[in-house]
Amino acid sequence: MMKAIRSFSILLSLWFAAFACAQTSADPVDVYIHSEMQREHIPGLSLLVAREGRIVRAQGYGLANVELQVPVKPETIFQSGSVGKQFTATAVMMLVEEGKVKLDDSIKHYIKGAPAAWDQVTIRELLSHTAGFGDYPKNFNFRKDYTESDLLKIVEDIPLAYPPGTRWSYANLGYLTLGILIHQVTGKFYGDFLKERIFQPLGMSTTRIISEADIIPNRATGYRLVQGQLKNQEWVSPTLNTTADGALYFSVLDLAKWDAALYTEQVLKRASLDQMWSVTKLSNGEPNSGHYGFGWEIETRDGYRVIGHGGSWQGFRTHISRYVDDKLTVVVFANLESAETGRLTDHVAKMYLDAH
């Protein structure tokens, strides 16, 4: 392993040196990415730039697997982290359009036996992280296997952090619960619903629920830095790679298909998409402090309107930013849990925006 890590460091240094020497003629995006990969010790990275749903650049950098010296390609598959939440939110909005779910209904209408404390918790609040749900408890065992009922019981036993609708607080357990809602409303496991209703119709052939047991061509390995040393990701139980808070595989090529579909009504009606991309309001009428819609963050950066989301899971960091008015989308995936993919995404976007 140490030999592989040394080889990786040498290889990345050689790449950077080559680009530094030829900086006057090299592509400035390549120069920037290689420089940042060296600075952050990122093994591998995948980049997508798209305009109006058409690919401008889909490129891999570095290594998908350090030990086997496998390079990243546009086809390389990374784990989604919380970028997967936008697919959960889309699935819920599909059910809303079909009249099977109402945004302002209590979650108790859809999840049998939910506690009395959830009486006032609405689907809208779960989608926007304003329901009072929290994150996994500190003593949660990520290496234990759970049934869906086990996970729901854990969530139900955690008191609400605040009255629903009064505050914003990012809540993975809220999205986990939405995945269970999808299952109970449709009779289909969350991942199967996404495959049938989103991934297959859009031709997202490599996007699926995580399974470390299955043979997955082009799958990247996730890494972490421990006291400056590159280490493999820590493993979690198979159950926790199937939850709706962000447990997908995908490539930047599949995200390009997703991005293109968002310019159409192929997945959802325009009114539903606009609702997802609008900052929700608290019960006092004020916008939530997280600038959050349904599965998307909505921000203004340097005068540009941006909808996006980041993710982190099992040695991977991901980010998607869609510059709405400029019809520019930038996606960065990295196989290092500490990679600053959001910052990289913004910088690459600025390079393209400044060039036009």
What are these language model-derived features?
Residues M1-I10:
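Bacterial N-terminal signal peptides that target proteins for export
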Residues S9-A18:
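Bacterial N-terminal signal peptides
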Residues Q23-Q59, H183-E196, Q200, V226-H356:
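Catalytic loop of the DD-peptidase/beta-lactamase superfamily, centered on the K-T-G motif
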Residues H41-G81, Q86, G99:
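N-terminal, post-signal-peptide region of Sec/Tat-exported proteins
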Residues G44, P74, Q79-V83, L95-K138, ...:
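Active-site helix/loop module of the DD-peptidase/beta-lactamase fold
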Residues L68-V72, E156-A161, Q233-N241:
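Short glycine/proline-rich turn/loop motifs
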Residues I77-Q79, Y110-A114, P137-F142, P163-R167, ...:
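Second-shell loop/turn segments in exported
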Residues S82-V83, S169-N172:
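Catalytic nucleophile serine of serine hydrolases
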